[in-house]
């Protein structure tokens, strides 16, 4: 998982990226999990830079390009590797010309992580670093989208559990490219409540990254 984190940091460091977020409610059809509605798609552009000791802190700006009604809405995120520092996020509402600080789910034990651009992604889902706040277990070696992967479980420790809506996540990590291809997220009753699928994995500046994420 440290290799995955390092790759994620490298893709955002002093780099300009375009990405597509797709979100939908999922259901079961023909014994397969699939979208139960038309996906809501947002096209984003982002730029970031890593700071701090070993370059493990980061600052990132993300701007919505599509749909047109949301163009110009932006998000500024500061992520810290230090477990004693909470990550910080601000949202710029272009239609109102206002900046709003949004909850990360870290600064207040009772706060729900905020939605990212009105999608099923939350600030918790986009957090990086702080792997020491999790118990990490390799559950299996399998395949995902035709790729050999490790199936890795992350369970938050007592401190992190107070800030998380997930009791655990299961990550399918590409063995060769160190990209997470799928994440299953479970609630306190061990019910899967969300699933992330990554696609359009491309080599950018010698780093593999997913250009499309569906939640």
Outline where the language-model segments fall:
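N-terminal mature ectodomain segment of secretory-pathway/periplasmic proteins
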Residues: 1-95
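A generic signature of intrinsically disordered, low-complexity regions enriched in glycine/proline
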Residues: 6, 21, 129-131, 161, ...
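Short amphipathic beta-strand and strand-loop transition segments with alternating hydrophobic
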Residues: 6, 43-52, 135-143, 199-201
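A short, polar/charged loop/turn motif at coil->beta-strand junctions and beta-hairpin connectors
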Residues: 11, 56, 130, 146-148
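Short, surface-exposed, charge-dense and proline/glycine-enriched linear segments
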Residues: 45-52, 61-62, 104-108, 132-137, ...
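Intrinsically disordered/low-complexity terminal segments and short unstructured peptides
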Residues: 61, 141-142, 168
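Gly/Pro-enriched, hydrophobic low-complexity segments
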Residues: 65, 76, 87-92, 98-127, ...
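Surface-exposed beta-loop interaction hotspot
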Residues: 118-137, 141-142
């Amino acid at each position: 998982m440290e290799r995955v984190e390092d790759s994620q940091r490298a893709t955002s460091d002093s780099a300009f990226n375009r990405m597509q977020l797709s979100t939908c409610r999922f259901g079961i059809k023909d014994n397969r999990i699939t979208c139960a509605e038309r996906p809501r798609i947002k096209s984003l552009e982002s730029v970031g830079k890593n700071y701090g000791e070993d370059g493990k802190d980061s600052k990132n700006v993300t701007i919505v390009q599509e749909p047109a009604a949301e163009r110009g809405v932006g998000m500024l995120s500061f992520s810290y590797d230090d477990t004693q520092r909470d990550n910080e996020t601000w949202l710029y509402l272009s239609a109102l010309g206002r900046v709003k600080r949004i909850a990360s789910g870290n600064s207040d034990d009772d706060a729900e992580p905020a939605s990212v651009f009105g999608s099923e992604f939350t600030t918790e889902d986009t957090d990086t670093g702080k792997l020491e706040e999790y118990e990490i277990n390799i559950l299996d070696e399998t395949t995902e989208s035709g790729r050999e992967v490790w199936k890795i479980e992350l369970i938050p420790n007592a401190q992190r559990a107070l800030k998380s809506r997930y009791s655990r996540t299961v990550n399918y990590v590409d063995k060769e490219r160190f990209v997470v291809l799928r994440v299953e997220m479970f609630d306190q009753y061990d019910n899967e409540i969300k699933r992330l699928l990554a696609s359009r994995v491309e080599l950018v500046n010698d780093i593999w990254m997913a250009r499309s994420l569906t939640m």
